[in-house]
């Protein structure tokens, strides 16, 4: 559902055969796959081995990751997947012209150290792209996600809020890491599901409702999500939530 965001960023930075792209918190690799399809040489880092296994499948890796020891997986599409975060030596040697941090669920405090390392060690002039939710009033999904915070509250479970929805939050994060803002934009990314059950399942898969499930139970959380989705159900039974995401281009 974030494909419009990925495509817009790739178009704006002319990602293609001459691009070496590094993705922070690459997740299950959809943005990497789209960049590789344009001919870019891509490298992705993530803390979650299970997500990297999904990314390897998407990149048509010739071998399985197995237990995924720290290190690289090189695929036939010039893709390299690594656990953790890039070390300064990797950033200096990689020659990356584009660095992305496009997962809006990554908290700013988690992302900040990696961005600081990029600012200190990546190639001067490299583009660094950050993304986050747009204004809450423009994001239907943000209203539904409030259910997670409310249900998790009784037991004090930590619920990461939608990241970087303030007007200058992306710029503040970039400047705080030593990067220079150099342009921004907004992209419409509607969340669409074939029915209510698919919408509930899809939202639960984000992990943002895990603390709510721990504080209550799965059935209660599913019930509350379904109720919150009611305003977004269409006459044909599908569910559609209009959302806006914002991206910032900064320079090393």
Regions found by a protein language model. Give the residues of each.
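Conserved catalytic/acceptor-binding region of the Class I
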Residues: 112-113, 119, 125-194, 210
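Class I SAM-dependent methyltransferase SAM/SAH-binding core
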Residues: 20-89
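A generic alpha-to-beta junction signature in SAM-dependent methyltransferases
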Residues: 13-15, 36, 115, 121-122, ...
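Conserved alpha-helix/loop element of class I SAM-dependent methyltransferases that forms part
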Residues: 1-20, 30-34
């Amino acid at each position: 559902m974030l494909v419009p965001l990925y495509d817009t960023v790739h178009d704006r930075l002319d990602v293609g055969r001459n691009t070496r792209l590094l993705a922070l918190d690459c997740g299950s690799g959809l943005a990497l796959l789209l960049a590789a399809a344009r001919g870019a040489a891509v490298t992705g880092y993530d803390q979650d081995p299970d997500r990297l296994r999904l990314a390897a499948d998407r990149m048509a890796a010739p071998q399985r990751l197995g237990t995924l020891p720290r290190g690289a997986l090189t695929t036939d599409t010039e893709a390299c997947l690594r656990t953790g975060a890039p070390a300064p030596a990797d950033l200096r040697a990689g020659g990356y012209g584009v660095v992305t941090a496009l997962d809006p669920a990554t908290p700013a405090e988690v992302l900040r150290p990696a961005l600081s390392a990029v600012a200190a060690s990546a190639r001067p002039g490299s583009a660094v792209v950050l993304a986050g939710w747009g204004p809450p009033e423009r994001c239907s999904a943000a209203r539904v996600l409030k259910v997670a915070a409310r249900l998790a509250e009784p037991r004090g479970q930590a619920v990461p809020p939608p990241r970087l929805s303030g007007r200058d939050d992306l710029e503040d994060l970039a400047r705080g890491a030593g990067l220079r803002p150099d342009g921004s934009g907004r992209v419409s990314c509607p969340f669409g599901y074939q029915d209510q059950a698919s919408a509930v399942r899809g939202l639960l898969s984000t992990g943002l409702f895990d603390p709510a499930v721990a504080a209550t139970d799965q059935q209660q959380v599913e019930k509350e999500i379904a109720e919150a989705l009611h305003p977004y159900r269409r006459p044909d039974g599908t569910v559609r939530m209009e959302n806006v995401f914002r991206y910032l281009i900064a320079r090393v």
